């Protein structure tokens, strides 16, 4: 209350920002007459001068220079837009452009021209000469926006590219990323970053820098999708568990008797009776013994799949596959899979083919990907409700931009009914009334299931209508465009065609504009506001109203008993409703509870990913160093050799390596032969003084002698690629270990320990082990490289060429848990640890390892072991 009073007296923080930006608008407008008089060539030359000025400035001072040239850049961009696109930026759009340039979020209502606003900040920041990324939620919007704005950018001397899922060729992607301005989806940008850090050549990396990104529909990408990490994964070399058996057990269990459901936290809690029943059905004595860990995990996932996840709400079944429905957008998330075996549990539940589990090869959250950018900004129609999260997680302020024309839409109070049936009956009556009048109506539902229910009711009443949900997603833009036609009735899940305007004729405006009916409050107020925002664009008339019932999930799970109490006291008859500010406030409080739960969940995910992110950055930085032809790889190998020998000698008699027993010397001799391919006699070891120096010089001379056959460039290239393979293999195994650690870490809470603290501690120790493993594995592998003195280096070149070609053109499935081809797994295992004695020999002789290279030493050839 006090804050509101102070805001009215001295103005809010937002008001003060807008006031400052308006001063800049005056400066930009003052330049307009001069630029209007210029010819096209003169205008283009003026912009080229700005480029020269910015690019001639020291990198650290370029941001300051951008602010200095902002008025000229914005004025030229606006004049160019008038000539090329026949659109002039309004003053409020200039403010939006300045907000974006300042690295903030511009909250602009539907129809205010966010696509055009972005051109101001994009054109300004591209002056620096680094690619600017414009991020959208889907391929359709990325392609549409880039094509619409490309003529303007070309006039200003910029090149434009669009990254979509259909661009499969690596060279084509590389060419697109070389453009000044790149449009694309958040998934494509994120996956390209991960793929870049699996490349074996710096030249083949597509993302050269992360200077500036504008995220369109920023709330959808940075909030709604923040809980789903981007993952590139490969098949697990482990036996598949019986998901069908776990599904049978789960289906035989009874709610309340065998388990309870915590709907607020979406969790299943198994009772003692349930544990006994499961043990009996699985045929085990103790479900929670270490050897039954997989069974208990699969049962947990099967219970979730059967009792917390519902078809046509959380997922659909299409083409013998379980496809996720995004809970926030209502769109199908094709290719994305639930992790930790939940997706396989859903496949077992629905009786479709079960796909194997996968192992993470590379992953990152959207939070940590977008936080890499030197400057990040965003646009959306709904951001204020999540302003705290944007500031806390991304350090992004939200600025509400005034509309160009006043909003005329009427937002009516919610109507609350006792039952869902009564609510839908009332909705049908209202739709019929509006349809008969000719006023278009857009009906929002929270799930596919509810939209299908409404569809059946309208069909029964013979009211013509169109349904837009994840099952009809291919027609999304077309359906939404037609939602403003006379008499149109459109049922939509919360996907509701973001980014597509519903334009109205004068006749429709006379009828009252687009009427919005919400059939249920979403868990997030922001999603409700998005639905309202479909109506009343650019000063158009419109109306919005929500119809609720006590049986709606939000009110049933999170709602206050006060609402039910009010309904009972009033003694409402069937079909009657209440309309009260008290009830509306209670609904909003319930939404705030859920929003806070989701915020904590996203923050929790980020806290864990921040730990992995530091490790990821360290590994990727080292990877880039290895890819650099100027990197001194020989020094790194020498360092590893010294480390490996220190490890070996530390296990012998402490500080007394000169008085080793014959048994210890024999053990040292065998280790040197098996691990380092160094043939040293027992007599030489006995005579060596000091022994550490003798062994070190022996290993070094052996290695240098066999590498003489290669010229320096070829040697460096081979050493770097082999080291990269070792690093990638070790990183893959480290990620698998980290996944396992994260899965079970919450159990530490039962032991009065903070799971996050324990995770940080153990992940740090695991990372130290990972570094040690790389050093040991690297020196062992390099010690086994063999050449014949008389052979030339053609084998080496042939290997390098073949490896590069295989590695760079590996087929990849583009999805949230991407899967690499089996061939890549074979290639990446080329330099794995020494095989077990009964495994096939890696030299491909067809013999067992114990009967081949283990006995006779490495075969002659490039990388024989």
Curated annotation (Swiss-Prot):
Signal peptide feature range: none
Q: Where in or outside the cell is it found?
A: Cell inner membrane; Cytoplasm
Instruction: Kindly report the protein's main subcellular placement as a broad class.
Output: membrane
Q: What is its EC number?
A: 7.4.2.8
Which SMART domains does the record associate with it? SecA_DEAD, SecA_PP_bind
Which keywords label this protein? ATP-binding, Cell inner membrane, Cell membrane, Cytoplasm, Membrane, Metal-binding, Nucleotide-binding, Protein transport, Translocase, Translocation, Transport, Zinc
The residues that hold Zn(2+) are 841, 843, 852-853
Q: Which co-factors does it depend on? A: Zn(2+)
One Gene Ontology term of the molecular function aspect? protein-exporting ATPase activity
- Judging by the UniProt lineage, the source's domain of life is Bacteria
What is the recorded membrane topology of this protein? Answer: Peripheral membrane protein
Q: Which GO terms describe its biological process?
A: intracellular protein transmembrane transport; protein import; protein targeting; protein transport by the Sec complex
List the catalysed reactions: ATP + H2O + cellular proteinSide 1 = ADP + phosphate + cellular proteinSide 2
First-tier enzyme category under EC: translocase
Sites binding ATP sit at 93, 111-115, 501
GO cellular component terms attached to this protein's record: cell envelope Sec protein transport complex; cytosol; plasma membrane
Q: Provide the cofactor note recorded for this chain's UniProt entry.
A: May bind 1 zinc ion per subunit.
Q: Among its keywords, does the record have Isomerase?
A: no
Give the family this protein belongs to, as stated in its UniProt record.
Belongs to the SecA family.
Q: How does it assemble?
A: Monomer and homodimer. Part of the essential Sec protein translocation apparatus which comprises SecA, SecYEG and auxiliary proteins SecDF-YajC and YidC.
| Functional description taken from the UniProt entry | Part of the Sec protein translocase complex. Interacts with the SecYEG preprotein conducting channel. Has a central role in coupling the hydrolysis of ATP to the transfer of proteins into and across the cell membrane, serving as an ATP-driven molecular motor driving the stepwise translocation of polypeptide chains across the membrane.
Q: What is this protein called?
A: Protein translocase subunit SecA
Which organism is this entry from? Helicobacter pylori (strain G27)
């Amino acid at each position: 209350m006090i804050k509101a009073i102070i805001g009215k007296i001295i103005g809010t923080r937002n008001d003060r920002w807008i006031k400052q930006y308006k001063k800049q608008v005056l400066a930009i407008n003052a330049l307009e007459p001069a630029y209007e008089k210029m010819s096209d060539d003169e205008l283009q030359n003026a912009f080229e001068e700005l480029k020269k000025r910015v690019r001639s400035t020291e990198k650290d001072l370029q941001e300051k220079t951008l602010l200095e040239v902002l008025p000229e850049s914005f004025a030229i961009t606006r004049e160019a837009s008038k000539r090329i696109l026949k659109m002039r930026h309004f003053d409020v759009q200039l403010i939006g452009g300045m907000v974006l340039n300042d690295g903030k979020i511009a909250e602009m209502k539907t129809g205010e021209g966010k696509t055009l606003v972005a051109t101001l900040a994009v054109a300004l920041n591209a002056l620096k000469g680094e690619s600017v990324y414009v991020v959208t939620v889907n391929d359709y919007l990325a392609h549409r926006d880039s094509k619409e704005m490309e003529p303007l950018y070309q006039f200003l001397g910029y090149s434009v590219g669009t990254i979509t899922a259909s661009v499969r060729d690596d060279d084509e992607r590389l060419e697109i990323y070389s453009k000044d301005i790149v449009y694309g989806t958040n998934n494509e940008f994120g996956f390209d970053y991960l793929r870049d850090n699996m490349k074996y050549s710096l030249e083949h990396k597509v993302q050269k820098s992360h200077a500036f990104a504008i995220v369109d529909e920023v709330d959808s990408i940075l909030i709604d999708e923040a809980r789903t990490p981007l993952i590139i994964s490969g098949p697990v070399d482990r036996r598949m568990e019986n998901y069908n058996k776990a599904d049978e057990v789960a289906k035989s269990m009874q709610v309340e008797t065998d388990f309870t459901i915590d709907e607020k936290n979406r969790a299943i809690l198994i009772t003692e009776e349930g544990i006994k029943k499961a043990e009996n059905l699985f045929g085990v004595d103790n479900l929670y013994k270490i050897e039954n860990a997989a069974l208990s995990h699969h049962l947990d996932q099967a219970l979730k799949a059967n009792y917390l996840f519902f078809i046509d709400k959380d997922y659909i079944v299409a083409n013998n596959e379980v496809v996720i429905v995004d809970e926030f957008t209502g769109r199908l998330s094709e290719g994305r899979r639930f992790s930790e075996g939940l997706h396989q549990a859903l496949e077992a539940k629905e009786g479709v083919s079960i796909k194997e589990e996968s192992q993470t090869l590379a992953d990152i959250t959207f939070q940590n990907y977008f936080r890499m950018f030197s400057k990040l900004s965003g646009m959306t129609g709904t951001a204020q409700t999540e302003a705290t999260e944007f500031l806390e997680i991304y350090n992004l302020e939200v600025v509400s931009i005034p509309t160009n024309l006043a909003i005329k839409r009427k937002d009516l109070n919610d109507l609350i009914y006792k039952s869902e049936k009564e609510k839908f009956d009332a909705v049908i009556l209202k739709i019929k009334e509006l349809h008969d009048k000719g006023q278009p109506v857009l009906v929002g539902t929270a799930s596919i299931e509810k939209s299908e229910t409404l569809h059946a009711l309208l069909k029964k009443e013979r009211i013509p209508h169109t349904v837009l949900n994840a099952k009809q997603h291919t027609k999304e833009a077309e359906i939404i465009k037609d939602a403003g036609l006379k008499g149109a009735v459109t049922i939509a899940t919360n996907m509701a065609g973001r980014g597509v305007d519903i334009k109205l004729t004068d006749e429709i405006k006379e009828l009252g504009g687009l009427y919005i009916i919400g059939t249920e409050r979403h868990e997030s107020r922001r999603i409700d506001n998005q639905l309202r925002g479909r109506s009343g664009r650019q000063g158009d008339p419109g109306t919005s109203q929500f119809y609720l019932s006590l049986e709606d999930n939000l009110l049933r799970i999170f709602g206050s008993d006060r609402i039910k109490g009010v309904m009972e006291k009033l003694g409402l008859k069937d079909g009657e409703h209440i309309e009260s500010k008290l009830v509306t406030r209670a609904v909003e409080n319930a939404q705030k509870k859920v929003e806070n739960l989701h915020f904590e969940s996203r923050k929790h995910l980020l806290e864990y990913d921040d730990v992995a992110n530091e490790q990821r950055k360290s590994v990727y930085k080292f990877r880039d160093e290895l890819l650099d032809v100027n990197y001194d790889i020989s020094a790194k190998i020498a360092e590893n050799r010294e480390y490996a020998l220190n490890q070996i000698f530390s296990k012998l008699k402490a500080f007394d390596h000169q008085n080793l027993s014959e048994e210890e010397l024999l053990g040292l001799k065998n280790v040197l032969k098996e691990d380092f391919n160094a043939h040293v006699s027992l007599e030489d070891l006995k005579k060596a003084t000091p022994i550490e120096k003798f062994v070190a010089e022996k290993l070094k001379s052996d290695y240098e002698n066999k590498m003489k056959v290669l010229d320096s460039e070829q040697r460096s290239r081979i050493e770097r690629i082999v080291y990269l393979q070792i690093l990638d293999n070790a990183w893959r195994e480290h990620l698998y270990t980290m996944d396992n650690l994260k899965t079970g870490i919450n159990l530490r809470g039962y032991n009065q320990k903070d799971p996050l603290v324990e995770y940080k501690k153990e992940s740090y120790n695991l990372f130290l082990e990972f570094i040690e493993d790389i050093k040991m594995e690297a020196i062992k592998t390099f010690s086994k490289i063999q050449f014949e003195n008389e052979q030339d280096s053609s084998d080496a070149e042939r290997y390098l060429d073949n490896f590069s070609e295989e590695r760079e053109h590996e087929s990849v499935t583009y999805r949230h848990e991407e899967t690499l081809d089996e061939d890549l797994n074979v290639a990446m295992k080329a330099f794995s640890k020494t095989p077990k004695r009964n495994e096939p020999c890696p030299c491909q002789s067809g013999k067992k390892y114990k009967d081949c290279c283990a006995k006779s030493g490495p075969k002659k050839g490039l990388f024989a072991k």
